[in-house]
A protein has these predicted regions:
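Structural preference for beta-strand elements that scaffold enzyme active sites
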Residues: 2-6, 46, 74-78, 98-101, ...
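Conserved anion-binding
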Residues: 19-23, 93, 97-172
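Glycine-rich, proline-tolerant flexible connector loops at the mouths of alpha/beta enzymes
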Residues: 46-64, 104, 165-176
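Glycine/small-residue-rich loop that forms an oxyanion/phosphate-binding "nest" at active or ligand-binding sites
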Residues: 53, 61-120
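Catalytic cores of alpha/beta
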Residues: 73-100, 181-215, 235
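C-terminal helical cap(s) of enzyme catalytic domains, especially alpha/beta-barrels
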Residues: 112-119, 207-221, 225-245
Length: 245
């Protein structure tokens, strides 16, 4: 297990949304690159970046910022938001993103998943499955899809994806704790460990994952590290300890 501090970019700034609601925005840093440097100095080796503008419009709008983070830090960058074509995928791969997250496109364009695996390989791809009540949400969490999260995870595993970020929308940005059982179910469907996202409030939430660490690849945290209820150092150490148990 490893920690992925989150940087969500909206209008060029590092923000967090509450439950994915674009009207409930908290700005934490006017410079996402500076925020990435801070996370690196605190011990992070990975970060999870979401282009919120791109998630809403369908076209990444903050690639230049992502490129600067890749170039100016040693962080491995997982990037999502608006990646809905092979051309966009290839562009992000070319600038050095470690992994690209496909979300809405997996539902709206199922053929893209297999084409993406052929283009960049399954290990550089993450299926971003955002769900509310077990149903996958799309278009920046604005729309329901009618697709069950576990069913989509199963399909992506068969398509060749090696990573999944599973986000519980109802918990995201709310610091209400993790739904451990849901992550285990997703890992079973996907047949690979999953990256847990949504609800981390403190180090104790990460510690709760220790008994199921075999099902958890990593943990994304956002608001908790910005507001100080969890430090990056604590999160990195807790992930490492959980893996050893």
């Amino acid at each position: 297990m490893y920690l992925l501090p989150a940087i969500d970019i909206l209008d060029g700034r590092a923000v967090r949304l509450a439950k994915g609601d674009y009207t409930q925005v908290t700005v934490y840093n006017d410079d996402p690159v500076d925020q990435a440097r801070k996370f690196e100095s605190q011990g992070a080796t990975w970060i999870h970046v979401v282009d919120l503008d791109g998630a809403r419009t369908g076209v990444p709008e903050n690639i230049a910022i992502v490129e600067r983070i890749v170039r100016e830090t040693s962080l491995s960058v997982e990037i999502g938001g608006g990646i809905r074509t092979l051309e966009t995928l290839a562009r992000l791969a070319d600038i050095g993103a470690a992994r690209m997250v496909l979300g809405t496109a997996l539902v709206n364009d199922p053929d893209l998943a297999r084409a993406a695996v052929e283009r960049v390989g399954g290990d550089r791809l993450t299926a971003g499955i955002d769900a509310k009540g077990g149903e996958v949400a799309v278009s920046g969490w604005i729309e329901g899809s009618g697709v069950a999260a576990c069913d989509l995870a199963r399909e992506m595993g068969k398509a060749g994806f090696k990573h999944i970020v599973y986000t519980d929308i109802a918990r995201d940005g709310m610091q209400t704790g993790l739904d451990v059982r849901a992550y285990v179910q997703m890992a079973e469907a996907f047949e690979h460990p999953v990256i847990a996202s949504g609800g981390v409030a403190s180090v104790s939430d990460i510690e709760r994952l220790a008994p199921v660490a075999a099902s958890i690849e990593g943990v994304i945290t956002g608001r908790a590290v910005y507001e100080g209820t969890l430090t990056v150092e604590e999160g990195v150490a807790a992930c490492a300890a959980a893996t050893k148990e």
